[in-house]
Amino acid sequence: MKKEKILVLNFGGQYDQLIVRRVREMGVYAELHECDTNLSEINLDNLAGIILTGGPQSVNDSESPKADSKIFDLGVPVLGICYGHQYINYVNGGTIETPNLAEYGKTDLKVDKESCLFKDIPEESIIWMSLNKQLSLSTFRSVLPYSARFGVSIVPPFT
């Protein structure tokens, strides 16, 4: 049996290599590609999931990076981090807004340990946040009611 792999699509964020390394340290092969790589150029055998990295742009910008929307049809879980989170919402018809006050810096994170997404993350951590865009929670839920698509607007505690 071949080893499962995670496809990491880079949207221009600064943590792409760190994400790949952390996935590999968990015993899962991770492969990094630029977000606009055509899926036909990627070996999708044994694909277990996809991670969409962060990036400095907003999906609302006409020149912002885009991925092949067929990634959502591959039948594997997709995790969007920061920009990747916005992108999942955007591709599925959601909207992204600019809040009145943008913030960046360290903050405390408290997670629900019952969520499969956070089960191996400490209940409390200090994380980096970059909040200059927001999604409406009701929009995100109505766009993706029952799917293995996750998004976080923080840089998870990789270090």
Regions found by a protein language model. Give the residues of each.
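Pocket-forming structural segment of enzyme catalytic cores
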Residues: 65-81, 86-159
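Flexible gly/pro-rich beta->alpha loop and the following alpha-helix that scaffold active-site loops
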Residues: 2-8, 13-80, 85-86, 92
